[in-house]
Amino acid sequence: MTELFIDGAWVAGSGPVFASRNPGTDAVAWQGESASAADVDRAVASARRAFAGWSALDFEARCEIVKRFAALLTERKEAIATAIGRETGKPLWEARTEVASMAAKVGISIQAYQERTGEKRQDMADGVAVLRHRPHGVVAVFGPYNFPGHLPNGHIVPALIAGNTVVFKPSELAPGVARATVEVWQEAGLPAGVLNLVQGEKDTGIALANHRQIDGLFFTGSSDTGTLLHKQFGGRPEIVLALEMGGNNPLVIGEVEDIDAAVHHTIQSAFLSAGQRCTCARRIFVPQGAFGDRFLARFADVTSKITADVFDADPQPFMGAVISARAAAKLVDAQARLVEQGAKPIVAMAQRDPRLGFVNAAIVDVTGVANLPDEEHFGPLAQVVRYATFDEAIERANDTAFGLSAGLLADDAKVWEHFRRTIRAGIVNWNRPTNGASSAAPFGGTGRSGNHRPSAYYAADYCAYPMASVESTQLTLPASLSPGLHF
């Protein structure tokens, strides 16, 4: 089983065998040997050797290879979408959009590098001031399972464009997608060692994160793991650390004219990707009174009709399975804990089969829960909070250590102006789902939701560092000398 990609070749790992499973059927989706610490060391060494040549390559030449990667992704869209669906449970319709986003990321990343970094010159006395940007060197990229193609791609593409070399450690729950993606890079003509793939579980990740020869670490994943990485690298200022983590995201519902539109956007916010987007709304703030009652009744009615099915079902479902049977069980347990604390189920969650990742979309009213835990339940579990005043809704929405996304559904522009000025989040949407984001805009949040703005336009900022120079083409003695100097 040659599932590692090191120095331009597919090789076997020397660590334990592990497997990924289709969460909708429990069938094995991928199996292979993990990378040991020695394998990780070889991958980092390969990236280090390749760095000089890759970073010295003309910018346009690097971009041509990356553009070929995008073209090949488009050609292989269906095969890669199938790999994504098989390992994650994501319906094919959604997996196809993920592949399209991967390809689109290339043009955006090239534009971002040129506009946010690149090279700038300004004439000055006796010379010219030049701003250039240099790659960091070898960067480790850690990918998540929820978007196993798109999210690591959002680190890898801008890193390569800037001239870095990469060691990629994907989620152990989606290694097959990583293999398929790296095969496309190989066919695109990426030189040996520029991108290396190390498959594995926790030990592989620890070996890579602790390696003394990496110059940067780009991570998308849970806030708990990202916080540990932040602590680990707190004493290593030489490492550039880019973290994109989770959120306990609020969606505030105003008394709108079109209740069905509000319900639609709430369902998209809370349950798209089976609630496994870091920007999904976890807390739904609904006004007290008759309007709020009507909204909740309609929200519950439409939610109760959502069915989850296998990724390639015909007709396609809105939701697939969550990533694993274990993840499904944790969500049901989270609901039970909330109920024990005083929450009232509106649409109760249940796991269809203990061997599979299928749960139904659920709504629980947590208004009466004292000291509501500030936790991200990564799945289709929406928590409703009833509010008396708009200021109360904003105050409670901001009562979180996270700050990734937030949304407002309201007809009044003045209400929106107040909301956007007072809410604390990196992505703030009006009359759009909380998980609606533009790849041409910054993506990321405040607080425990991360630092930098990985995976989108601002990724160029952390993939290269600025180098300032003052230059003159000719060495000459100044016309005016400093006091005390005699020539």
From Swiss-Prot:
It comes from Burkholderia cenocepacia (strain HI2424). This is N-succinylglutamate 5-semialdehyde dehydrogenase. One of its GO terms (biological process) is arginine catabolic process to succinate. The active site is at E244, C278. Belongs to the aldehyde dehydrogenase family. AstD subfamily. It holds the Pfam family Aldedh. Keywords: Arginine metabolism, NAD, Oxidoreductase. NAD(+) binds at G221, S222, S223, D224, T225, G226. It catalyses: N-succinyl-L-glutamate 5-semialdehyde + NAD(+) + H2O = N-succinyl-L-glutamate + NADH + 2 H(+). InterPro entries: Ald_DH/histidinol_DH, Ald_DH_C, Ald_DH_CS_CYS, Ald_DH_CS_GLU, Ald_DH_N, Aldehyde_DH_dom, SuccinylGlu_semiald_DH_AstD. Catalyzes the NAD-dependent reduction of succinylglutamate semialdehyde into succinylglutamate. GO terms for molecular function: succinylglutamate-semialdehyde dehydrogenase activity. Its EC number is 1.2.1.71. Pathway: Amino-acid degradation; L-arginine degradation via AST pathway; L-glutamate and succinate from L-arginine: step 4/5. SUPFAM superfamilies: ALDH-like. NCBIfam families: arg_catab_astD, PRK09457.1. PANTHER family: ALDEHYDE DEHYDROGENASE-RELATED.
